[in-house]
């Protein structure tokens, strides 16, 4: 479904963020991208979602190599949900991309409310985003992405700054959705709860990959890549 081949990326300051990364994501799969801070997870996710232009290498979605195809089919959420919640109300935030794409305001709001209802948060529709809890903001950010009807959800640290209850709510959503998921996280316990396969990144390269939970029970592999055993195995 999605293939990354020999992907390199260097920032203007000379930092090599990605060094020849290759990986494949299969349709319906829930894949974890894990690694220590600075391993390249977020940069890779931005490329996969078409938010950053490829410098060297290629990314194809269903055989098509196009930044526009990636943007259309892969929905990206940022580590900080506040970066996606900029409108006066939740329903306006969720409807924003639809209105920007040419849909009438009334129809966009109708669709946005249907999405909020499907996620069990229709009661938040008129609430200002800045008055939401961390967990509510995260789910609303998912709603905004779902409005674009992507085939793949690319999620950057979705458990960041969440309390246990909010974290559980996010995990429940990820369990229920039928979308293909690429989950970039350092939260190995969340990866175990959601994903069946993981790719470990280290200094911009693929260090290893494997199935879960097997990969995350190997202390030597995890420690070699700056990671610790998940809490459930500690």
Region roles according to the model:
Residues 106-124:
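Conserved ABC ATPase "signature" region
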Residues 128-132, 136:
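Conserved ABC ATPase signature
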Residues 191-193:
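A short, surface-exposed alpha-helical micro-motif characterized by mixed small hydrophobic
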Residues 205-228:
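Conserved beta-strand-loop-alpha-helix hinge in the C-terminal portion
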């Amino acid at each position: 479904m999605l293939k990354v081949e020999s992907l390199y990326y260097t920032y203007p300051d000379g930092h090599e963020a990605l060094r020849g990364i290759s990986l494949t994501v299969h349709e319906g799969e829930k894949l974890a991208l894990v690694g220590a801070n600075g391993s390249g997870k977020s940069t890779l996710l931005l490329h996969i979602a078409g938010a950053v232009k490829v410098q060297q290498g290629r990314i194809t979605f269903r055989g098509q190599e196009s930044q526009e195809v990636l943007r259309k089919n892969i929905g990206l959420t940022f580590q900080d949900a506040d970066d996606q919640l900029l409108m006066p109300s939740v329903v306006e935030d969720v409807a924003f991309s639809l209105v920007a794409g040419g849909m009438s305001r009334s129809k966009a709001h109708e669709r946005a409310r249907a999405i909020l209802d499907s996620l069990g948060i229709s009661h938040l529709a008129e609430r200002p985003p800045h008055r939401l809890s961390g967990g509510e903001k995260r789910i609303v950010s998912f709603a905004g992405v779902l409005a674009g009807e992507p085939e793949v959800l690319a999620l950057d640290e979705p458990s960041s700054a969440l309390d246990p209850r909010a974290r559980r709510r996010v995990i429940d959503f990820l369990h229920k959705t039928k979308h293909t998921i690429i989950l970039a996280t350092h939260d190995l316990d969340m990866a175990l709860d959601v994903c069946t396969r993981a790719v470990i990144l280290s200094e911009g390269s693929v260090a290893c990959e494997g199935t879960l939970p097997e990969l995350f029970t190997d202390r030597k592999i995890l420690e070699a890549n700056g990671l610790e055993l998940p809490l459930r195995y500690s």
